[in-house]
Amino acid sequence: MDYFTAIGGVAMFTLIIMSFVAIILAARSRLVSSGDVTIHINDNPDNDVVTPAGGKLLQTLASEGIFLSSACGGGGTCAQCRCRVIEGGGSILPTEEGYFTQGEIRNHMRLACQVAVKQDMKIEIDPEFFDVQKWECEVISNDNVATFIKELVLKIPEGEEVNFRAGGYVQLEAPPHEVHYKDFDIAEEYQDDWNNFGIFKYVSKVDEPVIRAYSMANYPDEKGLIKFNIRIASPPPRGPDGIPPGKMSSWTFSLKPGDKVTVSGPYGEFFAKKTEAEMIFVGGGAGMAPMRSHIFDQLKRLNSDRKISFWYGARSIREMFYVEDYDQLEADFANFQWHVALSDPQPEDNWTGYTGFIHNVLLEEYLKGHPNPEDCEYYMCGPPMMNAAVIDMLHSLGVEDENIMLDDFGG
């Protein structure tokens, strides 16, 4: 091989490499957006957002102070960040299709967390999202109210206010963290159960920020605070090894007075109808939260004269909470009654009230003798199996879906 042949080979090789680089750069320029784009929102120029291209629509809007609901934090699993992308969003992705009907797809409905911001866009969102705010709150208290449920109470920053409707929710943001269950402050009366189920052994290690939605237990006239009922999502005691504990619930159970928590909201759709129909509330477990918010709001703020009853299912007396609050409401308001059914009362409970599952008790003790159960409004929140059982029972009585309101936190 002579000198000129070698030089020619090197030159040819270099040319090939440079051609590949040029092709890659050209492709990148087409696939990876750069520069600023304009997002036109709700056909109102005052809402226009000019922002760098390249992110997802959910996070892009959040960076501009527009917080769409997203209980999964943008993972594409909660389907709460629904919006209408009229122009500039490309074709709907397979990860989105299962959350929409064909009619909704034709109407350009999308999940904001799945839509890439590559070019100018025209979108429509619920106007209420413009009122969503974000606060850094402080933990006031975080005490057990039942074996596996804590009441977390947060203080709103001075001068701020959460303008929410009863039945609404907010999103909590947890930073990356590692929490050890053995460090939790668990009330002494509940520690035996935690030890018997081996719960103190768990560790929750989370490497990325987590966002989850929680219904508020307070009602609008309880100012300056936000109150939650949060159940620990520990692995099932007889489940296979390796199931991780719940990311957000583990973190919230570790919180102590003075700790800071980032909250955004308010959001919601689990609102009371403005009618005169009888209201029947059905709850279980941590589903107590929106029940309390609604019932207190109807009676103490609105002074409603609607007939209202609350049916709550618990395992035993140790799992009952807010008992004094509801007893007082029943004493103060002639139009309100509340009932508890225990599914597994303990001998020491000396329980003489209703027993069994709450949907059966509601049916046998009240709805079977009700002249028009189909005319009542039903508001429910509880474990998925409870919700399904109540809905099936109501359907069997001829209650239409429009009269069944569900806060499906476990669905």
UniProtKB/Swiss-Prot annotation:
All copies of domain FAD-binding FR-type, residue ranges: 132-273
Listed transmembrane segments: 6-26
Cofactor: [2Fe-2S] cluster; FAD
PROSITE patterns to which the protein is assigned, alphabetical: 2FE2S_FER_2, FAD_FR
Catalytic reactions of this protein: a ubiquinone + n Na(+)(in) + NADH + H(+) = a ubiquinol + n Na(+)(out) + NAD(+)
GO cellular component: plasma membrane
Alphabetical keyword list: 2Fe-2S, Cell inner membrane, Cell membrane, FAD, Flavoprotein, Ion transport, Iron, Iron-sulfur, Membrane, Metal-binding, NAD, Sodium, Sodium transport, Translocase, Transmembrane, Transmembrane helix, Transport, Ubiquinone
UniProt subcellular location: Cell inner membrane
Membrane topology annotation: Single-pass membrane protein
EC main group: translocase
Domain of life of the native organism: Bacteria
Quaternary data: Composed of six subunits; NqrA, NqrB, NqrC, NqrD, NqrE and NqrF.
Biological role: NQR complex catalyzes the reduction of ubiquinone-1 to ubiquinol by two successive reactions, coupled with the transport of Na(+) ions from the cytoplasm to the periplasm. The first step is catalyzed by NqrF, which accepts electrons from NADH and reduces ubiquinone-1 to ubisemiquinone by a one-electron transfer pathway.
Name of protein: Na(+)-translocating NADH-quinone reductase subunit F
Source organism of this protein record: Psychrobacter arcticus (strain DSM 17307 / VKM B-2377 / 273-4)
Gene: nqrF
